[in-house]
């Protein structure tokens, strides 16, 4: 993962934010924008995890309330050498998952009931390993900063539109041009930067997640099924809060309008191809069939009481022992 590139992109967003502040209030406005950006990121650093979990009405679970799901995450965290994160369930039909938290010691992972119901245990393990990889790579903090700055830039762009820019510094045509730049170009640029940061980190999390769960094909199979599910099962909460879309393993937005054109995630087929190549290099060829052959569970799923097919393969079980066993 290129941390230098990420730092440069975040710096670029900060410059955009300060530039809009300058258009609104000259040098003083620029400094105020900088102070606001710092304050928002400090607030996001300490509170972003609580905010997003509350936004999606996530329910915290433990070994008693969700034994198999909790133990799976515990085993994967041990594989990764991470502290045990808090574990959440989101009551949402669309299969998806995300991680949040400012550092590995204050991390949380969340999966939707749609994910736990529709995917095999192997696939769920691949997904949760991917989310733990984000925690280990500290992507959750980076993306919180990026999302905060992107939201702030859009907010200031709207202010510039309504206020018409700084009257003293932007009269006539230049004032109109400056306002248009603040209203359209800066938020658009912030969105592009946000996507660039998100996409580079997804590939790294896929690779590390495959290492954590031990089988890249579990994750590749899961990505395909989640992507198909996201196209036909809307996530209403995500549609209302599109700034959080980058947090999920697959873009939860429905694809209406410009969602597909400006995706926060790399192309799913490219991610699957990279994982399949990784599996081939590891000499793993048959695990994908085990995962893909598992019928979607319509029972209690691997987070609650053990269902008949919770092991993933009703024909004698999986050849591969996963961390849920």
Swiss-Prot record:
It comes from the Bacteria. It is an enzyme of class 3 (hydrolase). GO terms for biological process: proteolysis. Its EC number is 3.4.24.-. GO terms for cellular component: plasma membrane. Pfam families: Peptidase_M48. It is found in: Cell inner membrane. One of its GO terms (molecular function) is zinc ion binding. Residues 288-325 are annotated as: Disordered. CDD domains: M48B_HtpX_like. The chain crosses the membrane at residues 20-40, 145-165, 173-193. Zn(2+) binds at residues 130, 134, 202. Disulfide bonds: none annotated. The active site is at residue 131. Its cofactor is Zn(2+). InterPro entries: HtpX_protease, Pept_M48_protease_HtpX, Peptidase_M48. It is a multi-pass membrane protein. The keyword Magnesium does not apply. Belongs to the peptidase M48B family. HAMAP family: Pept_M48_protease_HtpX (MF_00188). This is Protease HtpX homolog. It comes from Brucella abortus (strain 2308). The gene is htpX.
């Amino acid at each position: 993962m290129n941390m230098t590139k990420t730092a440069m992109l975040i710096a670029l967003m900060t410059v955009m934010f300060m530039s809009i502040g300058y258009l609104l209030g000259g040098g003083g406005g620029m400094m105020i924008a900088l102070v606001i950006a710092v304050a928002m990121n400090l607030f996001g650093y300490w509170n972003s995890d609580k905010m997003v979990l509350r936004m999606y009405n996530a329910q915290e679970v433990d070994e008693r309330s969700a034994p198999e799901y909790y133990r799976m995450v515990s085993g994967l965290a041990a594989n990764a050498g991470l502290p045990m994160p808090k574990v959440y369930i989101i009551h949402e039909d669309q299969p998806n998952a995300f991680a949040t938290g400012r550092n590995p010691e204050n991390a949380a992972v969340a999966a939707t009931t749609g994910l736990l119901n529709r995917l095999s245990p192997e696939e769920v393990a691949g997904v949760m390993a991917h989310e733990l990889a984000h925690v280990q790579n500290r992507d959750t903090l980076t993306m919180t900063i990026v999302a905060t700055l992107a939201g702030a830039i859009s907010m200031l762009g709207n202010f510039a539109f309504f206020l018409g820019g700084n009257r003293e510094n932007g009269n006539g045509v230049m004032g109109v041009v400056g306002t248009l730049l603040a209203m359209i170009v800066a938020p658009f640029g912030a969105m592009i930067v946000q996507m660039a940061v998100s996409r580079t980190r997804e590939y790294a999390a896929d690779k590390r997640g495959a290492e954590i769960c031990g089988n890249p094909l579990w994750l590749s199979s899961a990505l395909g099924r989640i992507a198909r599910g996201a196209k036909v099962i809307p996530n209403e909460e995500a549609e209302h809060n599109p700034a959080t879309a980058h947090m999920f393993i697959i873009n939860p937005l429905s694809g209406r309008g410009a969602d597909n054109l400006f995706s926060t995630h790399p192309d799913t087929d490219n991610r699957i191809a990279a994982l399949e190549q990784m599996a081939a290099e590891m000499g793993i060829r048959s695990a994908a069939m085990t995962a893909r052959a598992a019928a979607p569970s319509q029972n209690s799923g691997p987070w609650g009481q053990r269902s008949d097919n919770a092991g993933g393969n009703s024909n004698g079980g999986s050849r591969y022992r996963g961390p849920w066993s």
